[in-house]
Amino acid sequence: MPGKGDAPVLPGARAVARYVRISPMKARRVVNLVRGLPAKEALTVLQFAPQAASEQVYKVLASAIANAENNERLDPDALLVSEAYVDEGPTMKRFQPRAQGRAYRIRKRTCHITVVVEAVAPAAPTKAASKKAAPAKQTTPAATESKTEGAE
């Protein structure tokens, strides 16, 4: 049973890609683009993102959407990327031979990419939205004429 301060648990699914051979900083840059977006829109953003990491993040997001659709029976059009984060994986250490017997260390960094999608309930129209939908008040021609006459 949820506690007093707990938010209601929404249905959703997650997908994790582990030991991805991309620098965590570069992957985080791509993940930050899609966090909070609707899932279908996030796929489109990733499809046209120029970063190399966007391909891996696209695969993880597509897997999370498929998990939600197949395991949780959720509508893929009603999904939102609620969480998306990148953790650092193990670093493979290599060396580059240099002149005069030296060797420089090369760090081949890996990361773990996690994407969580949740179903969102359709938002009820609020009072502010209904005010925007109301037509603007029209002024009568007589009222505008009297204002212009006084200005002359």
Swiss-Prot record:
Spans annotated as Disordered: 124-152
Organism: Salinispora arenicola (strain CNS-205)
Xref: SUPFAM superfamilies: Ribosomal protein L22
GO molecular function: rRNA binding; structural constituent of ribosome
Assembly and interaction partners: Part of the 50S ribosomal subunit.
Origin organism lineage: Bacteria, Bacillati, Actinomycetota, Actinomycetes, Micromonosporales
PROSITE patterns attached to this UniProt entry: RIBOSOMAL_L22
Protein name per its UniProtKB record: Large ribosomal subunit protein uL22
NCBIfam families: rplV_bact
GO biological process, any: translation
InterPro entries: Ribosomal_uL22 (IPR001063), Ribosomal_uL22_bac/chlpt-type (IPR005727), Ribosomal_uL22_bac/org-type (IPR047867), Ribosomal_uL22_CS (IPR018260), Ribosomal_uL22_sf (IPR036394)
Highest taxon above the source species: Bacteria
Keyword terms, alphabetized: Ribonucleoprotein, Ribosomal protein, RNA-binding, rRNA-binding
Entry GO CC: cytosolic large ribosomal subunit
Family recorded in the similarity comment: Belongs to the universal ribosomal protein uL22 family.
Described purpose of this protein according to its UniProt entry: This protein binds specifically to 23S rRNA; its binding is stimulated by other ribosomal proteins, e.g. L4, L17, and L20. It is important during the early stages of 50S assembly. It makes multiple contacts with different domains of the 23S rRNA in the assembled 50S subunit and ribosome. The globular domain of the protein is located near the polypeptide exit tunnel on the outside of the subunit, while an extended beta-hairpin is found that lines the wall of the exit tunnel in the center of the 70S ribosome.
Alphabetized PANTHER family for the sequence: CHLOROPLAST 50S RIBOSOMAL PROTEIN L22-RELATED, LARGE RIBOSOMAL SUBUNIT PROTEIN UL22M
Annotated disulfide bonds: none
Compositional bias (Low complexity): 124-143
